[in-house]
């Protein structure tokens, strides 16, 4: 049974090489329960025939369906690649491994840019990581297994005739190659930094390509396969206090918090994202901060290995492929000097405003087919320009009212998906490995949002009996609601308690006033839909109500709230926000933008709960009103 997997999948595909030379066995597995699969069906295809249509099913997206534009969304996630090209790359890294065996022990070499437009991390391509190959022997892919279809990547397990497995990550082509190039280059360098400098256990990366011109014919990352279980298996956010699984609950909090502690342990010298220094040879030197990424490095192999360059935080790149990269995006991506932490917020606002303006211009010119109301885009412009305007005043960076303010403002590494779903515990040593550094960046801890698995913005309940009057007299339905609030509060409190244990100088970042001050920026970072600009407005209006108090305590720079809202502005906002909440409540699967896990989708379709329309979209059949 494959262990490097994610709960909730509905299908798994396998391609295997048969004993017949040059043949590939395609295996498609339909799963009806999590982690449980039926006996697979087998289809054979020639190894060298990259254009065999029998393979297409292996590359198609199968883990979910969309109510709207299902065909188009799945086509965007089609990840066809060259198996023969992958085979060549595997043979190349084993040749490099033999060469690395001659290097002095402990020597850390820089990445090697190969002639086939891939990059090898030769310090990882060593026999202890990938095994040895006999002279004149060739590496052969024996089995390919599709083990995860995530939000951003397709994950394949690659087995070889050397009894050595690898992981191949193929990003979905949801954005242009320039975006994917920056993202992959930074993620690989960041994982290298986390491994070699911070001592964080991550899968070793062996080779990667940033575009489709390499032998794989797709951007890719080839990395170590870790056999084990996801830490999420032990996470139950609604566990009862004193449960028999309490130790598992506590261990999850500890493991994730320990990773965070290592991520933020080193103060860096700029804000942005991490890249390899030798990316400079083909790039623009102005993209990178000239000084060292951090101070005090004594290992000559690590000196000048990494640089800080443009931020690859997802919010800065999402849905911006239509912008002119050099003129409209690059000026807002950093890197930013450590003396200007609030420029991150300012540039986030300016970039999103520029994006909305461009989309309006494209619609007016008739060059955009997107279905978006101009009023929504105009409101976004106002919202993001307000965010940019208030950015310099959100925090008084010289305040004494917030303890250890300079520690909170220092550049530190931020992992946007710090979550039990991204931590795998290996089978043999029971050691935790942190996965998926996509979108990682360096920014002040005071601007880093809490991990999503413990984040909670609702009413806080710390003790059901003390905080809720006559709790025992409530109905069972009311008790369940309050118990849910209590458990979410408890989870967040346990996380913050662990933060205080590990990093006491950073604990004031979770103080309620600090959370409120950064809330407009966090709402911008976490925005998922067009209408959620309203959540940024809501945070700004909440700040308006308490600004005078914050100013009196020297938490902010200006005595007067920097933004102007008329009575009509506020009334319109309240009305629009109410409509958004009603839409989220009344629209099925609104929280997932209409995406439904495939096993659930099939059940709903077969039962008649969802109905296919003539245009290919699906509607959810509303239950008939009871008489």
Swiss-Prot record:
Disulfide bonds: none
Keywords: Mitochondrion, Transit peptide
Location of the protein in the cell: Mitochondrion
Transit peptide per record: 1-43
Mutant lacking the gene: phenotype: Increases frequency of mitochondrial genome loss.
InterPro entries, per the entry: Kinase-like_dom_sf, Mito_inheritance_9
Cellular component aspect of the GO annotation: mitochondrion
Note: Present with 8200 molecules/cell in log phase SD medium.
Stated family: Belongs to the AIM9 family.
Protein name: Altered inheritance of mitochondria protein 9, mitochondrial
UniProt gene name: AIM9
């Amino acid at each position: 049974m494959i262990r490097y997997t994610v709960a909730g999948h509905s299908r798994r595909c396998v391609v295997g090489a048969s004993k017949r030379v040059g043949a590939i066995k395609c295996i498609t597995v339909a799963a009806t329960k999590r982690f449980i699969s039926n006996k697979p069906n087998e289809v054979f295809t020639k190894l060298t025939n990259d254009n065999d249509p029998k393979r297409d099913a292996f590359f198609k997206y199968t883990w979910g369906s969309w109510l709207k534009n299902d065909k188009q969304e799945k086509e965007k996630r089609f990840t066809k690649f060259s198996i023969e090209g992958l085979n060549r790359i595997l043979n190349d890294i084993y040749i490099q491994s033999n060469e690395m065996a001659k290097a002095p022990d402990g020597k850390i070499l820089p990445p090697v840019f190969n002639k086939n437009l891939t990059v090898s991390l030769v310090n990882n391509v060593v026999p202890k990581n990938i095994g040895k190959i006999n002279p004149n022997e060739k590496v052969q892919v024996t089995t390919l297994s599709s083990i995860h279809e995530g939000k951003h990547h397709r994950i394949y397990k690659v087995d070889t005739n050397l009894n050595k497995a690898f992981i191949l990550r193929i990003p979905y082509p949801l954005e242009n190659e320039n975006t994917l190039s920056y993202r992959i280059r930074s993620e690989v360098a960041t994982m290298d930094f986390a491994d070699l400098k911070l001592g964080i256990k991550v899968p070793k990366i062996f080779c990667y390509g940033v575009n489709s011109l390499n032998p794989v014919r797709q951007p890719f990352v080839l990395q170590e396969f870790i056999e084990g279980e996801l830490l999420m298996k032990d996470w139950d956010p609604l566990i009862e206090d004193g449960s028999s699984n309490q130790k598992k609950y506590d261990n999850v909090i500890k493991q994730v918090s320990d990773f965070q502690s290592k991520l933020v342990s080193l103060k860096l010298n700029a804000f942005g994202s991490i890249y390899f220094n030798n990316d400079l040879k083909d790039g623009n030197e102005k993209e990178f901060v000239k000084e060292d990424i951090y101070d005090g490095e004594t290992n000559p192999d690590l000196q000048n290995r990494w640089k800080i360059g443009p931020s690859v935080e997802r919010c800065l790149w999402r849905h911006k492929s239509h912008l002119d990269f050099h003129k409209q995006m690059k000026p807002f991506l950093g890197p930013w000097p450590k003396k200007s932490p609030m420029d991150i917020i300012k540039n986030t606002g300016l970039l999103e405003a520029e994006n909305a303006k461009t989309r309006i211009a494209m619609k007016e010119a008739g060059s955009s087919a997107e279905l978006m109301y101009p009023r929504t885009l105009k409101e976004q412009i106002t919202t993001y320009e307000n965010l940019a305007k208030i950015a310099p005043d959100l925090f008084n960076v010289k305040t004494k009212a917030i303890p250890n303010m300079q520690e909170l403002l220092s550049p530190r590494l931020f992992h946007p998906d710090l979550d039990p779903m991204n931590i795998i515990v290996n089978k043999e040593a029971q050691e935790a490995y942190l996965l998926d550094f996509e979108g990682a960046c360096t920014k002040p801890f005071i601007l880093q949002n809490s991990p999503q698995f413990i984040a909670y913005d609702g009413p806080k309940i710390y003790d059901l009996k003390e905080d809720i009057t006559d709790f025992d007299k409530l109905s069972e339905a009311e008790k369940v609601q309050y118990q849910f609030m209590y458990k979410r509060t408890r989870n967040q409190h346990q996380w913050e308690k662990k933060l205080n244990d590990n990093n006491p100088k950073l604990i004031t970042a979770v103080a309620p006033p600090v959370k409120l001050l950064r809330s407009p920026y966090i709402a911008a970072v976490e925005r998922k839909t067009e209408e959620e600009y309203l959540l940024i407005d809501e945070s700004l209006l909440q700040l308006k109500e308490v600004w005078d108090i914050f100013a009196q305590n020297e938490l902010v720079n200006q005595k007067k709230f920097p933004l102007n809202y008329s009575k009509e502005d506020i009334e319109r906002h309240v009305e629009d926000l109410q409509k958004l909440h009603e839409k989220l409540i009344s629209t099925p699967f609104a929280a997932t933008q209409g995406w439904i896990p495939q096993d659930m989708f099939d059940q709903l379709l077969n039962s008649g709960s969802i109905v296919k329309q003539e245009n290919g979209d699906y509607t959810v059949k509303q239950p008939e009103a009871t008489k």
